Amino acid sequence: MAADAHAPTASEYIVHHLQHLQNIKQKSIIDFSVVNLDSVAVSVILGVLGLFVMWLAARTATSGVPGRFQAAVEMLVEMVDNQAKANIHNAQSRKFIAPLALTVFVWIFLMNAMDLLPVDLLPVLWQGATGDSHAYLRVVPTADLSTTLGLSSAVLILCFVYSIKIKGMGGWAHELVTAPFGTSKNPVFALILGVVNLLMQIIEYVAKTVSHGMRLFGNMYAGELVFMLIALMGGAAAMSLSGVLLPVGHIIAGSIWAIFHILIITLQAFIFMMLTLIYLGQAHEAH
């Protein structure tokens, strides 16, 4: 009884906050039967919220002097549209890709922004709702590698779709075995070059997809850990120091990191969106 009631150590606190609410207990590093229910639920809710905000902006838009909300949305839409035009030169493709890029930016920004909530706020509320003081809940979907790799894999699939749509199946297949080293009139050399080119293409696709997802995950995971350490500093202040010096330091450190983190979450959403546009633009180009 006493063992269950003791306050968690710093390592126990961090480990607990890094555990997901899952459908079944994970038994290995790679287990496709495991679903991180918290990441799925939060990402879906934020996706619906993002769509509602953009719908509301379109619904309330006026032709007169725009309000602050409309002006901010118009600036965002114009920024994304300019980036889409710079990377996607096919006007027909842009009709789908530009709104997709806007959706990606807004969705990832909202998921990243969950990191600004107090570390224990939603987990404690969830524990109270379930009646389980040890219930797990992580609320930053982009700090979950399965989420970010899922997003980057979706971009990879779109790259395949547009490569086939623009170049045709034959044209894309020819590109896979002739780029980047070309081919040869000699059948033996042509076969060797074809195998090498295909391997290089596979490596390139895998590397781009993994780095695309890992970049977002790494930044958000690190940010989440920093917030946990700041929260632990507040706990240490309450237990070890009389007065208000360390608690004030805890508040100041948390505020400074939160302000800096606003830049990080925005920048990471922008980078993911830009790489999406760049990769889809490359799918339109002949190599």
Curated annotation (Swiss-Prot):
It is found in: Cell inner membrane. SUPFAM superfamilies: F1F0 ATP synthase subunit A. InterPro entries: ATP_syn_F0_a_bact/chloroplast, ATP_synth_F0_asu, ATP_synth_F0_asu_AS, F0_ATP_A_sf. Keywords: ATP synthesis, Cell inner membrane, Cell membrane, CF(0), Hydrogen ion transport, Ion transport, Membrane, Transmembrane, Transmembrane helix, Transport. Its main location: membrane. CDD domains: ATP-synt_Fo_a_6 (cd00310). GO terms for biological process: proton motive force-driven plasma membrane ATP synthesis. Pfam families: ATP-synt_A (PF00119). GO terms for molecular function: proton-transporting ATP synthase activity, rotational mechanism. GO terms for cellular component: plasma membrane; proton-transporting ATP synthase complex. It is a multi-pass membrane protein. The keyword Transcription does not apply. The chain crosses the membrane at residues 37-57, 96-116, 144-164, 187-207, 224-244, 266-286. Belongs to the ATPase A chain family. F-type ATPases have 2 components, CF(1) - the catalytic core - and CF(0) - the membrane proton channel. CF(1) has five subunits: alpha(3), beta(3), gamma(1), delta(1), epsilon(1). CF(0) has three main subunits: a(1), b(2) and c(9-12). The alpha and beta chains form an alternating ring which encloses part of the gamma chain. CF(1) is attached to CF(0) by a central stalk formed by the gamma and epsilon chains, while a peripheral stalk is formed by the delta and b chains. Key component of the proton channel; it plays a direct role in the translocation of protons across the membrane. This is ATP synthase subunit a. It comes from Acidovorax ebreus (strain TPSY) (Diaphorobacter sp. (strain TPSY)). The gene is atpB.
